[in-house]
Amino acid sequence: MIHIAWLGKKSPFCGNVSYGNTITKKLKGRGYKVSFIHFDNPTNKDFSPSHFLGNNPEVSLPYLIKSQVYTIPSPRAERDLRESLALLKPDVVHASLTLSPLDFRLPEICKELNVPLVATFHPAFDSKLRNLTASTQQVTYQLYAPALANYGKVIVFSSSQKQLLQKLGIDENKLVIIPNGVDQNIWKPLASFSNKHNLIKKKIGQARVFLYMGRIVSEKNIETLLKAWKQVKKNKL
């Protein structure tokens, strides 16, 4: 059984939390052992021998500040991370970036422990540079590129991301594109109309309804989405 140490987020809720929960659930369902390491208020049991003997142990790292965007770890967090990985002895470490300044220390830690290191790098990305926020996103990529070059593999979601990271000096062979996907077992048309569905139709009418769930930011390409919806209406598809 392959043992994966997954460094990710449990809170506060954001896309990174959803990504980590979804992927680790699928991995466990396929028989992989997953140890989830994240920032939280650790308890004494986190480093007890019995805790690390579980099938899917969870380890908490101490922090000073935690937000949806970034976490500032406590001074002892790096030591706790190193010790937990040494005790867990995973076959591979996966980091769902960006998390914290420890992202930059992971390559050295994993090299010392002789364990492969993989990252999913998915900070917000807008290649069109239409505003200050998009420019700030570019700075994030520039800041992380030297560290990512020391990871074994880096998963990105698009060819645009891959091309940018290549320009920033990361070997093409280290970059792997795995596009975002949709779980068709969850997101699918209703098999039958429910009372709730009928109530909604009663309120808004029988016209076709498009629903967007997400942040109102440029990298979500909402303008393109709206144009596509208008085209659907125009062509009566």
Language-model features: where?
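A short, charged, and often flexible helix/loop element on the N-terminal side
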Residues: 48-82, 136
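N-terminal subdomain of nucleotide-sugar transferases
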Residues: 1-44, 113-115
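Carbohydrate-associated surface elements
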Residues: 40, 160, 181
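Nucleotide-sugar donor phosphate/pyrophosphate-binding loop at the beta->alpha transition
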Residues: 116-118, 125-150, 192
